[in-house]
Each structure stands twice: as structure tokens, then as C-alpha cells.
Amino acid sequence: MPLEQDSLLPEQLYALKSLQTRKGIVEITEKTKIDIEITELGAKIVNSKISSEEMIEQITPEILKKESSWKGKRFRRYNMTSGVPAIYGGKRHFVNQAVDYGRKIWTEMGFKEMTGDMVDSSFWVFDALFTAQDHPVREMQDTFYINKKTSLPDKKIVKAVKESHEKGVDGSKGWAYNWDEEDAKRLLLRPHTTCVSARTLASLKKEDLPAKFFALGKCFRNETVDWSHGFEFNQTEGIVIDPNANFRHLLGYLKQFFKKMGFDKIRFSPAYFAYTSPSVEIHVWHSEKKVWLELGGAGILRPEVTIPLLGKHIPVLAWGPGFDRVLMDYYQIKDLRELYKNDIAQLRKIKFWMK
């Protein structure tokens, strides 16, 4: 008579262990015992009056072809509220959806798009923008450098930038140091898209003016990563080159853009940047964190930037706020790191960018 192992006495277990070492004496088999008990809902269904009438649940082409298959029979009602399996169709990454929308806004506002490489020279990233070669932002703790150098652009532009740094232009004194051409050749991952604006300004001719340009692309900084900072981010860039442009126009462009992006609360505060004067910081209200979120800077480019690149000083409105922070409020994201964490569930369920 088979015995259950759990019911054996200690001495029986000892005997079993000894006999298991001998072949053909003990046979152990494993069986699964399942106890089933009807639930309260099941009991209600059993006691209810369920019709045994045959009903058609699906209407198929085969059923419709034969009148005898459906005539005189009943069709089961469709329950429009019953749960169905979720279907996740293919779609663009939600950050890319927002980036495309940002491009659409600038285009509708009459701007032309600028593009540029993510790897650029220190000349275009810093020197052309009147950032001194001993400025802290150029140190390795802020910028990702590449262990290679590149050639410099047209000698005329290089000479003009060098003089701007060493002696100044239009009455300024510059930075009063010896500008190093070799330092300007260093390659780096661009920390901002303003280098694209610098290249664009240098390529313009008199007949191209007035003009409005924008860029929206990836930037990289050696930042301490937290909920509002990342080492990789999108930035939206803009320049307006117009002899009649003024500071009020600058604020107007920015207000219009961020309102179209869905922000009602926008404010500006005075700021300092090496290549603009006057300068402002742009802030929008983050409804989830209940704080004013700083997006970046804007201002009118200094003569030390415009004269070397354009040949003369013309008012150039310029801005370069971070774009990823703009998305946080719409997607109810509390941490910038959530934008790129490769969470499949998030990518499937997050809403489309619709404004």
C-alpha cells in the first residue's frame, strides 16, 4: 500500500533513506493534489437561470453565406464595456514627437532651420562666441573633449576673432590676453547649439538679411545628473538678424514659442552671459514640482561676436533654452532621467504629444 512521505514516522524516514541506496526496492512517485472550491460569484452563476439556447457569438463570412446558418437564431449581445487586451501600435519616441512639434512651431513663426554636427571645434563653440580661453566653462569638468584637433575656418574670420579676444572691438578692450590658435582647434561634443548659430552668421551675405533661424538638437555637458540635469539633452536655438530688432522683440518671440508649447506662466530675469548683452534667463512654471524651472539664456549678441562673424555690428537676437525640461510638465514626468530610461511599459502607455 503506497504511503505519503509527509505521514511517515521518524524511524520510517530513516529506513526510507537507507533503502533508497539500494536499487529496485523503493519507488518514489510525485503527485499533485488540487483542491477546488467554488467562489461566491460561481455559486451565483450556478443558481441563476442560464439558458441552454444556442447563440451565435461571431458573425463570419461563412455564416452569412448560408441563410440556414443564422435565420431564426439569436445573436449574443456585444458588451461594449467589457475588458479587451491592450494593443500597442508602433509610434515614434515621445521625445521625438515633441521635438518635431517644436520644429513645427518655429517654422510657422517664419524661421528657417539650421543644422550642424554634434562634434565641433572649440573655435565655433567658444571662441567665435567671445568665451575667453581661460573661462571655467571650457574646463574638462564641464565639457566633453575629444583627443583630436581640427583645422580652423577662413583666415579672415580667425584673425577677426583673435583681435576681438585680444584687443576688443567697437570700443571694448576684449579679454586682454594672448589668444591661442591651437586651443581653438580642439574637438569636443557640443555643449550647446549656439555653435550652429555662429557658423550660420559667418556664412551670411548682405543680401540674406534680415533673416530668422532656429535649431533643435542634441547637446552634451559633463553635468552632475539629477532630476533637472542630464549629460545629454535637447536644446532649441534661435537667432534673428535684423537692423530693426530690439530686446522687446526677443521677449516676444520667446513668449510666443513657450505659449505654443503649453506654458501660460513664463517669466524672465536679468542674467549674465559672455556673448550677449543685455541678457535674460527664461523660466516656466513646473506645475508638478511647484517651482519655476530655469530653461536657459537669451539676449542680444555682443559686438565682439557679430563684428568678426558679420563684418559689422547688426542687432542679433539669440536664445538657447533647454528643450527637454519643457516636456516634463506635459508628460507629468518628475525626473529628466525618465525621458531616456528605455522602459518598454512607459513607451507603450505614454500619451502622444498633441497640442
Task: Pin down the residues of each PLM region.
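Short amphipathic alpha-helical interaction segments
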Residues: Q5-R22, E27-I28
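TRNA-recognition modules of translation machinery and tRNA-sensing kinases, especially anticodon-binding
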Residues: T32-K355
